[in-house]
Amino acid sequence: MSLFDWFAARRKDQFVGKVIQEAEEADGLWGKCPECSQVVYRKDLLENANVCSNCGHHNRINSDERIKLIADQNSFKSTDKHLSPVDPLGFKDRRAYADRLRESQSSTGMKDGVTTGVCQVEQIPLALAVMDFRFMGGSMGSVVGEKITRLIEKATNQKLPLLIVCASGGARMQEGMLSLMQMAKISGALERHREAELLYMPLLTHPTTGGVTASFAMLGDLILAEPKALIGFAGRRVIEQTLREKLPDNFQTAEYLLDHGFVDKIIPRTQLKKTLGVLLRLHGYREKRK
């Protein structure tokens, strides 16, 4: 083979390799970590609970994926699946609230932004609620509040520990006061759960903000968080403009809140289930007898 033919073959191989790589990326085989820009094989990412193996960045996951990570296989039994939101105010901003609901329901396959149910974690019964940020930013409307309240009441009646996975932009403005009153309703149900001397653990994921932070996200016996999760009430820019001060770079992160006593423990996603089992046993909960 002449030198010219060798270079021609090399160029062809490089071109074909580039086409194959672009095709694989288009098919969703590869992804790029938003934190460290490392190119990762999507299958490896999924097998690692959507956590980047290079930098540990926790990518956002949906409620179904979260339940699979937490609950023992085939143990999750959903509750109140029939509840669906309505548009009591006929609210419309740039778009009608009813249209936003239909779009979110179509894209997520959910009726609203939380999945509730009872499961087992390392064979220990647990009441579990998982918010899903895909559904209108995980906002808390009347159905989200009602489903969480009913789950808390079920946990109280059945003497179950409770875990709520928070991922929310706050109260759903399109429902006005009906949304805001969910804060008090859920808090009241949690107080009755506490009076029954039962364990409640919120898990704060990225992001947990607004009315959710101002209510049930901060009422736990043990407040857990994922690494680098954004946790706060008002936005950083609003606070800086109000105080006229520059805030620390890590302000409103899980690590900042841990340092200042607002969070009890930061748990990497890959260690969550094992850690939950340990915490439940430390608080006297035992495996369900067969």
Curated annotation (Swiss-Prot):
GO biological process: one example: fatty acid biosynthetic process
Catalysed transformations (reactions): N(6)-carboxybiotinyl-L-lysyl-[protein] + acetyl-CoA = N(6)-biotinyl-L-lysyl-[protein] + malonyl-CoA
GO MF terms, alphabetically ordered: acetyl-CoA carboxylase activity; ATP binding; carboxyl- or carbamoyltransferase activity; zinc ion binding
Transmembrane portions of the chain: none
Gene3D superfamilies: 2-enoyl-CoA Hydratase, Chain A, domain 1
Subunit text: Acetyl-CoA carboxylase is a heterohexamer composed of biotin carboxyl carrier protein (AccB), biotin carboxylase (AccC) and two subunits each of ACCase subunit alpha (AccA) and ACCase subunit beta (AccD).
Keyword annotations: ATP-binding, Cytoplasm, Fatty acid biosynthesis, Fatty acid metabolism, Lipid biosynthesis, Lipid metabolism, Metal-binding, Nucleotide-binding, Transferase, Zinc, Zinc-finger
Cofactor: Zn(2+)
The protein, known as: Acetyl-coenzyme A carboxylase carboxyl transferase subunit beta
GO cellular component assignments: acetyl-CoA carboxylase complex
Sites where the protein binds Zn(2+): 33, 36, 52, 55
Pfam families hit by this protein: Carboxyl_trans, Zn_ribbon_ACC
Localization of this protein: Cytoplasm
Cofactor details (free text): Binds 1 zinc ion per subunit.
Zn finger spans (C4-type): 33-55
Species for this entry: Prochlorococcus marinus (strain MIT 9211)
Job description of the protein: Component of the acetyl coenzyme A carboxylase (ACC) complex. Biotin carboxylase (BC) catalyzes the carboxylation of biotin on its carrier protein (BCCP) and then the CO(2) group is transferred by the transcarboxylase to acetyl-CoA to form malonyl-CoA.
Enzyme Commission (EC) number: 2.1.3.15
